[in-house]
Amino acid sequence: MSRFTEKMYRNARTVTTGMVTGEPHEPVRHTWGEVHERARRIAGGLAAAGIGHGDAVGVLAGFPVEIAPTAQGVWMRGASLTMLHQPTPRTDLAVWAEDTMNVIGMIELKAVIISEPFLVATPVLEEKGILVLKVADLLAADPIDPVETGEDDLALMQLTSGSTGSPKAVQITHRNIHSNAEAMFVGAKYDVEKDVMVSWLPCFHDMGMVGFLTIPMYFGAELVKVTPMDFLRDTLLWAKLIDKYKGTMTAAPNFAYALLAKRLRRQAKPGDFDLSTLRFALSGAEPVEPADVEDFLDAGKPFGLRPEAILPAYGMAETTLAVSFSPCGEGLVVDEVDADLLAALRRAVPATKGNTKRLASLGPLLNDLEARVVDENGEVMPARGVGVIELRGEPVTPGYITMGGFVPAQDEYGWYDTGDLGYITEEGNIVVCGRVKDVIIMAGRNIYPTDIERAAGRVEGVRPGCAVAVRLDAGHSRETFAVAVESNAWQDPAEVRRIEHQVAHEVVSEVDVRPRNVVVLGPGSIPKTPSGKLRRANSVSLVTQ
């Protein structure tokens, strides 16, 4: 039995901890033992349907109460799990079905397990000849024991957030999960007896599926889990649950903390909830903006939020989940560097005066990983030299499944090219500057889109998190860029002119270069991934029409 499954099953039989779901209307607590018994039934149903060792299964379910036993049931059969992209009420089901069929064919899924709120997709999938298994039917089966699993068996195939038309899935093995889970346990100073995890993160994203479902199930940790829709309906539910359950650990992308800060200021008053129990509030999955972190800490202070609770981190699906954590209890550490030297010489030189740039330190590497930074010739850079971050170690995926077949993620020496530009400090802390493919090169300077987007976001009338910088003329001797922003006033010509002018002004103030053009769009126009990241490459048409 793999170390991952052996420990998960053992903890299910021995711990009294569990998972609370159904908040805020019908909270129910399920012990991990109860989840395990449901998983044995689901495994029985899967066996009856012919699912066995080495098979791949897709899952289309919205509620953690069903996703947890379904995932464990799939692993009991020695099969791998893929959380499929979920249709929304606005999704064209015919287009979604075509994209989903691409994924099903690519991964060679043997079946799709389905439940609410996606049962409406059942006939669409069955028409395409897909074996559809309903969670309710699987739960009615007789329970069976798990089959043997090996360290290099596939556990997860995590769809990346690229184009749905040309999908790609990251292969995650039992060995990968065990290694990264144990490393995070150490990095988070986890205490199974005391810690309570609170999360609304989606299970179709690695941070929600691995960090806040698989790992608590593996360690037998106390978990309170709601859905992203619950969070979007009531952002303050997040704070309410931390208060109600004395939550000690949570995680989210930068934008979610910025949103919570706004809601705390506008809709809550001191005494409404107590956030003082929170010791580990991880910020990851997108660039960590020091100003947003500081704003969140300021907004949370009247509610007992401690500044040392915030934990900037670095991670990706290709390393199972996590690469580095800031040290517990240290809070936000800002690396302030000379912005001109960073742009022109690719060197992160500490500075406190003049034109400086503030970057969040993302902490030292977790166990079982090593990192290096290389230049365009593959030469290893010294400390504070800016280049491409490469990673090696046990949590790193063997590779991807693509429409063209398997593509290895590691070179012959085991190094994985992250595509992230950054540097490592003298103390061994990782700092990320941006994505290689998004950086705009003008007159030999590296201009990072996040700087442009942050400047545009300062303009009154621009919706939070809804500004995108788009690289134009990539590869030409002089690249340029344009900016698209969303505003509720997009149909008011006078407001549009004001926003265009002010965005251009703020961008010039920030990066000393004027955008080729600024476009003001209505809400929902800028494409984003399911986890809320900007799709910069998909935004070109917004600024070139």
UniProtKB/Swiss-Prot annotation:
| Entry-linked SUPFAM superfamilies | Acetyl-CoA synthetase-like
An example GO CC term for this entry is: plasma membrane
Cross-link Isoglutamyl lysine isopeptide (Lys-Gln) (interchain with Q-Cter in protein Pup) residue location(s)? K528
The answer to whether keyword Cytoplasm applies is no
Question: Where on the tree of life does the source sit, at the highest rank?
Answer: Bacteria
- Name the Gene Ontology molecular function terms of this record: adenylyltransferase activity; ligase activity
Keywords attached to this Swiss-Prot or TrEMBL record, sorted alphabetically, are: Isopeptide bond, Ligase, Ubl conjugation
E.C. no:
6.2.1.-
Q: Indicate the segments annotated as coiled coil, or none if absent.
A: none
| Signal peptide interval | none
The cross-references to InterPro entries, in alphabetical order and at most eight, read:
AMP-bd_C_sf (IPR045851), AMP-binding_CS (IPR020845), AMP-dep_synth/lig_dom (IPR000873), ANL_N_sf (IPR042099), FAAL/FAAC (IPR040097)
Q: Can you list the disulfide-bonded cysteine pairs?
A: none
UniProt PTM comment: Pupylated at Lys-528 by the prokaryotic ubiquitin-like protein Pup, which probably leads to its degradation by the proteasome.
Top-rank EC class of the record's enzyme: ligase
Instruction: Give the GO biological process terms.
Output: fatty acid biosynthetic process
The entry's family comment says:
Belongs to the ATP-dependent AMP-binding enzyme family.
Task: Give the NCBIfam families listed for this entry.
Answer: PRK07768.1
| Official protein name in the record | Putative ligase MSMEG_5435/MSMEI_5285
